[in-house]
Amino acid sequence: MSHYRQRFLQLALDSNALCFGEFTLKSGRISPYFFNAGHFNSGAKTAALAQCYADAIDAANMNFDLVFGPAYKGIPLATALACEYARRERDLLLAFNRKEVKNHGEGGTLIGAPLNGRKILIIDDVITAGTAIREVLRIIRNAGGTPTGIAVALNRQEIASETNRQSSVQALMAETGIPVVAIATLSDLLAFVEENASLAKFYEPLLAYKTHYGTEASD
């Protein structure tokens, strides 16, 4: 497993962004783990997370010149990532959207650098159903930008349903042709747990969950 994947999973565990137990998801499934990026709630944690994002993005050789953060969780993630790239001596443009239309001041729903003519990387925490990210793609294209990649923290690699064996990420990539990179996946989490003696008791529940709900192909 890549060092940045291990660093991310350890960071998530230490920050309580990654928890093990029994969690009822919005889908109704009982998951043996839960991921909440809201627990990366300090400057140090967010900076460390941004380093992991940048490492994953660089490993995927993504082509972009603007980082876009969808409201709301994507905004601090995109800001932190742009700062991390500046630290690496690569100055990227930054933009994000607001969910409420502003009728005074600068107006509109977009804030930051103009999107027109830009190659845009979208950054978010996870992709669940993919509905929100499709709306972001529409916003970017309407503003004249070209989405060239999507980066998320964790890819759960779960099938949409018993009759639809694709994950939301697989369906999104097949539909749009836009690559999606994740810092880590459910497969990585399984390997991480297997390699850590203190987490050994969570391995079998995770494996059972992946066997039942996991996608057949990697994504």
Curated annotation (Swiss-Prot):
Record-listed 5-phospho-alpha-D-ribose 1-diphosphate binding positions: 26, 72-73, 98-99, 102, 104, 124-132
EC number: 2.4.2.10
Binding residue positions for orotate: F34, F35, T128, R156
GO annotation, cellular component aspect: cytoplasm
Keyword flag Iron: no
Cofactor(s) of this protein: Mg(2+)
CDD domains listed in its UniProt record: PRTases_typeI
Pathway: Pyrimidine metabolism; UMP biosynthesis via de novo pathway; UMP from orotate: step 1/2
A single GO BP: 'de novo' UMP biosynthetic process
InterPro entries: OPRT, Or_phspho_trans_dom, PRibTrfase_dom, PRTase-like
Catalytic activity annotation: orotidine 5'-phosphate + diphosphate = orotate + 5-phospho-alpha-D-ribose 1-diphosphate
Pfam families according to UniProt: Pribosyltran
Molecular-function GO terms, alphabetical: magnesium ion binding; orotate phosphoribosyltransferase activity
Superkingdom, taxonomy of origin: Bacteria
Subunit structure: Homodimer.
PANTHER family per the UniProt record, alphabetical: OROTATE PHOSPHORIBOSYLTRANSFERASE 1-RELATED
NCBIfam families, A to Z: pyrE (TIGR00336)
Family: Belongs to the purine/pyrimidine phosphoribosyltransferase family. PyrE subfamily.
Function comment: Catalyzes the transfer of a ribosyl phosphate group from 5-phosphoribose 1-diphosphate to orotate, leading to the formation of orotidine monophosphate (OMP).
Protein name: Orotate phosphoribosyltransferase
Source species taxonomy: Bacteria, Pseudomonadati, Pseudomonadota, Gammaproteobacteria, Lysobacterales
Gene name in the database record: pyrE
